[in-house]
């Protein structure tokens, strides 16, 4: 069987078994395609390579300038692939078992100050239907901490404006209920009344925030919109990421004393350690303020 066919069998297996998102599956496919392209040049296959071949491949990637984070993601995909090939008896061993992960730098998530968030949220011209949509989306994102993928795929049946809640189906098909808040609720109502009908052009759509072609927005389109408003707000776009408002949501909650387990629940994190990064952000902020304003800082 060809290597490409084995990869597709593997991806189908983990998509069903692990309920991974399409974005994760696409990342795995991209990484593993790079592996089999390298193997072809070495006249090797997924079945006859050994651990030294994998180490050589990873070493070449690092020498080519790929970041440790990219290499760690690739290694994760490779481990899952070879575990699958071993389990399904395509191989008699797992050559990835002896590989060590590259050491990753501890990075704090990028976030905005409360004033920067206010400036960003006030940037759209709400008299324009498209920008009214963007305003409602950003308000909802900051109010709930949704992932961008969760936001753009949000459907009408999963939002209850009267109760002020959204039902989110997140990673691993895990469901959570998140309150919206008054400000976001107001702007969603405004969009539903005055913006959404204009964007739909008489068509029907299940998604709350359709594109100007009445389709579901892509993550890339929303990220482009965020950067547009950041530039209008004099915010350095190099300090941003697509999840900047999600990070701001969590960081500002922690700064104001929110219980970490509540933040974990709202974000949909399965592990509290993932949420604890925001306590480090808060500590870094306090340290910065102390150094800036204390006479002996």
Swiss-Prot record:
<dbReference type="InterPro" id="IPR010998">
    <property type="entry name" value="Integrase_recombinase_N"/>
</dbReference>
<keyword id="KW-0229">DNA integration</keyword>
<feature type="active site" description="O-(3'-phospho-DNA)-tyrosine intermediate">
    <location>
        <position position="278"/>
    </location>
</feature>
<dbReference type="Pfam" id="PF02899">
    <property type="entry name" value="Phage_int_SAM_1"/>
</dbReference>
<feature type="active site">
    <location>
        <position position="171"/>
    </location>
</feature>
<dbReference type="InterPro" id="IPR013762">
    <property type="entry name" value="Integrase-like_cat_sf"/>
</dbReference>
<dbReference type="GO" id="GO:0006313">
    <property type="term" value="P:DNA transposition"/>
</dbReference>
<feature type="active site">
    <location>
        <position position="269"/>
    </location>
</feature>
<keyword id="KW-0132">Cell division</keyword>
<dbReference type="InterPro" id="IPR023009">
    <property type="entry name" value="Tyrosine_recombinase_XerC/XerD"/>
</dbReference>
<keyword id="KW-0159">Chromosome partition</keyword>
<comment type="similarity">
    <text>Belongs to the 'phage' integrase family. XerD subfamily.</text>
</comment>
<dbReference type="InterPro" id="IPR011932">
    <property type="entry name" value="Recomb_XerD"/>
</dbReference>
<dbReference type="InterPro" id="IPR044068">
    <property type="entry name" value="CB"/>
</dbReference>
<dbReference type="InterPro" id="IPR050090">
    <property type="entry name" value="Tyrosine_recombinase_XerCD"/>
</dbReference>
<protein>
    <recommendedName>
        <fullName>Tyrosine recombinase XerD</fullName>
    </recommendedName>
</protein>
<dbReference type="GO" id="GO:0051301">
    <property type="term" value="P:cell division"/>
</dbReference>
<feature type="domain" description="Core-binding (CB)">
    <location>
        <begin position="1"/>
        <end position="86"/>
    </location>
</feature>
<keyword id="KW-0963">Cytoplasm</keyword>
<dbReference type="Pfam" id="PF00589">
    <property type="entry name" value="Phage_integrase"/>
</dbReference>
<dbReference type="GO" id="GO:0003677">
    <property type="term" value="F:DNA binding"/>
</dbReference>
<feature type="domain" description="Tyr recombinase">
    <location>
        <begin position="107"/>
        <end position="291"/>
    </location>
</feature>
<dbReference type="GO" id="GO:0007059">
    <property type="term" value="P:chromosome segregation"/>
</dbReference>
<keyword id="KW-0233">DNA recombination</keyword>
<keyword id="KW-0238">DNA-binding</keyword>
<dbReference type="InterPro" id="IPR011010">
    <property type="entry name" value="DNA_brk_join_enz"/>
</dbReference>
<keyword id="KW-0131">Cell cycle</keyword>
<feature type="active site">
    <location>
        <position position="243"/>
    </location>
</feature>
<dbReference type="GO" id="GO:0005737">
    <property type="term" value="C:cytoplasm"/>
</dbReference>
<dbReference type="InterPro" id="IPR002104">
    <property type="entry name" value="Integrase_catalytic"/>
</dbReference>
<comment type="function">
    <text>Site-specific tyrosine recombinase, which acts by catalyzing the cutting and rejoining of the recombining DNA molecules. The XerC-XerD complex is essential to convert dimers of the bacterial chromosome into monomers to permit their segregation at cell division. It also contributes to the segregational stability of plasmids.</text>
</comment>
<feature type="active site">
    <location>
        <position position="246"/>
    </location>
</feature>
<dbReference type="InterPro" id="IPR004107">
    <property type="entry name" value="Integrase_SAM-like_N"/>
</dbReference>
<feature type="active site">
    <location>
        <position position="147"/>
    </location>
</feature>
<comment type="subunit">
    <text>Forms a cyclic heterotetrameric complex composed of two molecules of XerC and two molecules of XerD.</text>
</comment>
<dbReference type="GO" id="GO:0009037">
    <property type="term" value="F:tyrosine-based site-specific recombinase activity"/>
</dbReference>
């Amino acid at each position: 069987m060809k290597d490409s066919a084995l990869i597709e069998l593997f991806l189908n297996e983990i998509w069903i078994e692990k309920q991974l998102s399409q974005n994760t599956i696409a990342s795995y496919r991209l990484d593993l395609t790079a592996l089999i392209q390298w193997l072809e040049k070495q006249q090797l296959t997924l079945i006859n390579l050994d651990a030294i071949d994998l180490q050589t491949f990873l070493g070449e990637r690092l020498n080519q300038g790929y970041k440790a984070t990219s290499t760690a993601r690739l290694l994760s995909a490779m481990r899952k692939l070879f575990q699958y090939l071993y389990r399904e008896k395509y191989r008699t061993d797992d050559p990835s078992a002896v590989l060590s992960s590259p050491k990753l730098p501890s990075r704090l998530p990028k976030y905005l100050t409360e004033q920067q968030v206010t400036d960003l949220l006030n940037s759209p011209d709400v008299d324009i239907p498209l920008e009214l949509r963007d305003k409602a989306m950003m308000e909802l994102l900051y109010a709930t901490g949704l992932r961008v993928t969760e936001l753009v795929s949000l459907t009408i049946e999963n939002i209850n404006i009267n109760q002020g809640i959204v039902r989110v189906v997140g990673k691993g098909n895990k469901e959570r209920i998140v309150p919206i808040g008054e400000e976001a609720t107001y702007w969603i109502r405004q969009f539903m009344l005055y913006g959404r009908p204009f964007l739909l052009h008489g068509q029907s759509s299940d998604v709350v925030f359709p594109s100007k072609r009445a389709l579901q927005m892509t993550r890339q389109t929303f990220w482009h919109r965020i950067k547009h408003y950041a530039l209008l707000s004099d915010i350095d776009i190099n300090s941003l990421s697509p999840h900047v408002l999600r990070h701001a949501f969590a960081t500002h909650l922690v700064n104001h004393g929110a219980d970490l387990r509540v933040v974990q629940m709202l974000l949909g994190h399965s592990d509290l350690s993932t949420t604890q990064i925001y306590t480090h952000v808060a500590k870094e902020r306090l340290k910065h303020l102390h150094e800036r304003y204390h006479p002996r800082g």
